[in-house]
């Protein structure tokens, strides 16, 4: 799916996702420009090239697909706002812009959020409810993205979801850190009344996740269903540690 929009046809990818009932897709074609300048600037040619996949989706499927813009926290505020302004000028209507600047710089994130009409999402990279509280108090995000593998686990994630709800904001649990984290995130999504969307990386869900575990939540017609079993429902495949390509790390308390 990454290659489909990076070097192929993002419109065809959007059509493929829609056949599964998936109505939102995230793309990050701006990263190369950020690496070139350390996020300080983006040239007109780079900006135009990065906008093309988004234009293509709108051309092929219209408004049937929500478009999320991922910036991976790579930009300084002026360049991030330049990107946002490009979307504001065109009839693309992104659902959100995610992590436009470093998420640990709440002041910079707030300057961005207050400088654009587009919704801002942040951030799976924050490590506990304290960071999210600062984010929310600064009014620096419209949507709250969290990753249970990075924010402190299920208990901390639930506290963050409740905190976001108290500010009137929805959450969107992140997927990219493995099948167990994703399954736990699905359970949080079902539990939290302010869940907007549960992210899933289709290539992972249909690929290497299935090589590691059983009991993954089911994705059907754009919705997630978890198994009616105790816990998160995921179990490692038998013999996984014995695979020739497996790397086993053991930790313990002496």
Task: Annotate each language-model stretch with its function.
Residues 85, 92, 96, 102-227:
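Shared catalytic-loop signature of beta/alpha-barrel
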Residues 213-254:
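C-terminal extensions of enzymes
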Residues 5, 45-49, 152, 177, ...:
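Catalytic cores of large soluble enzymes that bind and process phosphate-bearing ligands
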Residues 1-110, 115:
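Metal-dependent enolase-superfamily TIM-barrel catalytic cores that perform enediolate-based chemistry
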């Amino acid at each position: 799916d990454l290659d489909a929009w990076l070097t192929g046809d993002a419109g065809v990818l959007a059509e493929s996702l829609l056949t599964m009932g998936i109505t939102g897709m995230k793309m990050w074609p701006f990263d190369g420009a950020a690496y070139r300048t350390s996020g300080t600037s983006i040239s007109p040619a780079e900006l135009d090239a990065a906008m093309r996949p988004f234009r293509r989706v709108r051309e092929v499927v219209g408004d049937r697909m929500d478009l999320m813009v991922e910036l991976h926290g790579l930009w300084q505020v002026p360049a991030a706002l330049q990107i946002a302004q490009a979307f504001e000028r065109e009839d693309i209507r992104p659902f959100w812009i995610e992590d436009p600047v470093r998420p640990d710089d709440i002041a910079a994130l707030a300057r961005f959020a207050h400088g654009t009409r587009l919704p801002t999402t942040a951030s799976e990279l924050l490590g506990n409810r304290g960071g999210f509280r600062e984010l929310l108090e600064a009014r620096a995000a419209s949507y709250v993205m969290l990753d249970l593998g990075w924010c402190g686990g299920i208990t901390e994630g639930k506290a963050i979801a409740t905190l976001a709800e108290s500010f009137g904001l929805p959450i969107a649990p992140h997927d990219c850190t493995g099948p167990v984290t994703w399954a736990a995130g699905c359970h949080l999504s079902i539990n939290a009344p302010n869940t907007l969307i549960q992210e899933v990386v289709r290539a992972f869900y249909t690929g290497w996740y299935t090589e590691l575990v059983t009991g993954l939540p089911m994705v059907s017609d754009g919705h997630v269903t978890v198994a009616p079993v105790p816990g998160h429902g995921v179990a490692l495949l038998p013999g996984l540690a014995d695979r020739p390509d497996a790397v086993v790390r053991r930790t313990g308390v002496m």
